[in-house]
Amino acid sequence: MGPVATAPVAAPSASVRTTVLAGVGLAIGLVVLAAMAFPGHPEWFVKFGGQGHYTPYAQQVLGEDLLVPLDDGHDGQGYWLQARDPALLNGSREATIFDRPAYRAQRMLYPTLAAPFRLAGEQGGLWGLVAVNVAAIGLGTFFAA
């Protein structure tokens, strides 16, 4: 058998590239604005809540000056906790903090992709969650364009 012929893969059109760049540019612009409004507090993107189970642990890890913008936190809290331990090696701790551990354990792609950023420290882990979001916006825009 000889080599298999493959059809050439067309490069994305200029309009697709422009759309993706606009979407990613807008996302990065919003990240920059938020980072300027809350300098040194990337946890703002996580949206910890004052009445949640996550906040006391987050204050232990990230410091007492943790920015807590809401009464009730958002899903970012759970993703932050999962990104700290994506293999659930310390599952007993997570089970005491998670609002719904079985539900959260089914949603592992995002925190697993963000987890390596934690090699740069806790702040790196927080920025990793943001970076993965921006990358997802880029991919989603590409496939939708």
Per-region residue spans from a language model:
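Transmembrane-helix motifs of polytopic, lipid-linked glycan transferases
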Residues: 114-119, 128-145
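Short hydrophobic/aromatic helix or loop-helix immediately within or flanking a transmembrane segment
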Residues: 73-122
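Charged, low-complexity, helix-prone segments enriched in Lys/Glu/Asp/Gln
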Residues: 24-31, 90, 125-129
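Start-transfer (signal-anchor) and selected internal transmembrane alpha helices
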Residues: 1-59
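Aromatic- and Gly/Pro-rich amphipathic surface segment
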Residues: 50-70, 78
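Juxtamembrane/transmembrane-helix boundary motifs in multi-pass membrane proteins
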Residues: 9-13, 120-125, 129
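Aromatic-acidic/polar surface patches that form glycan- and anion
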Residues: 68-72, 102-106, 133, 137
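Membrane-embedded alpha-helical segments of multi-pass membrane proteins
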Residues: 49-53, 109, 131-139
